[in-house]
Design a protein with these regions (language model features):
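Soluble FAD-dependent oxygen oxidases
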Residues: 1-270
């Protein structure tokens, strides 16, 4: 039966423990998530370049009234002592309400997405490139904070998608598990829009080039986290994209829905 409550909360770690934190991210993506389908984690690294500060956080979720003593051991003491941890048995709605209240309104945001195989060296290089380039390019932008989140994607998760009706995205399950990553930039002033968007493009491009050079990259781009200009449908296999175009042409031959829906990614334009 579905749990009436779940174990959920956010742990925060000091930047002096960054290597241990990244070890935990790797181990959960490679071993923890595939081993226990009740467990999920959202590891997010937030950096504030004007303050020369980086914060390491992990939202932990376990879908059971009974907690697992081992699945998050790499994010708890003594392996990795948090400076704060709200992980507890509670209704999911209570957790969502508490975290939603922390989100400020009125700020400007940009997103980009990346994907890679689960590799410890790749995680380190992604982290180092992101932190160093945000610091060098955006330290003078008012209110700038940036984050990168490693979202673990398991082989079983992808297989269930295939079993329920195909794999239009063409994700190569044989290479799973993956990290589908989201980069986020938040800032204050409209006058900084161009600078932040340009930096976001450059940082993402540089990380992708690094991943491709060392065969860490994965082609799929997760639309929900993508940013303006990213070629989402073009990351699908060519045959799948052609099929999607045929389906679109069959059900919207006059492009009524295609043209009336403002913005976003369009199969017709891919």
């Amino acid at each position: 039966m579905p749990s009436s409550k779940v174990h959920i909360g956010i742990a925060q770690f000091d930047q002096s423990h960054s290597r241990g934190y990244l070890d935990g991210v790797y181990n959960f993506g490679k071993y923890g998530a595939p081993a226990d389908s009740k467990a999920a984690i959202i590891p997010t690294i937030l950096t504030f370049p004007s303050a020369n500060l980086t914060v390491y956080a992990a939202a932990k979720f376990y879908d059971s009234l009974t907690d697992s003593p081992t699945v998050f051991e790499n994010f708890t003491a003594p392996q990795l002592p948090p400076v704060a941890d709200s992980y507890a048995l509670q209704p999911l709605a209570d957790y969502i309400a508490a975290t939603d209240a922390l989100q400020p309104n009125g700020l400007r945001q940009a997103f980009r997405t990346l994907s890679s195989v689960v590799d410890r060296d790749a995680i380190q290089e992604i982290h180092d490139t992101f932190i160093s380039q945000v610091s060098s390019k955006l330290a003078t932008v008012a209110g700038l904070q940036a984050s990168i989140t490693f979202q673990p994607v398991t082989k079983s998760f992808l297989q269930k998608s295939v079993d329920s009706g195909g794999n239009p995205q063409g994700v190569d399950i044989s290479k799973a598990p993956f990290f589908w990553m989201v980069e986020n930039w938040t800032w204050t002033l409209q006058t900084d829009d161009n600078a932040v968007q340009a930096a976001a493009d450059t940082i993402t491009s540089d990380i992708n080039a690094l991943l491709a050079e060392k065969s860490y990259g994965a082609t799929y781009l997760y639309m929900n986290d993508a940013g303006k200009g990213q070629r989402v449908f073009q990351s699908y296999p060519a045959a799948n994209l052609r099929k999607l175009k045929l389906i679109r042409a069959k059900y919207d031959p006059l492009r009524i829905y295609t043209n009336l829906l403002a913005g976003g990614w369009k199969v017709a334009d891919a």
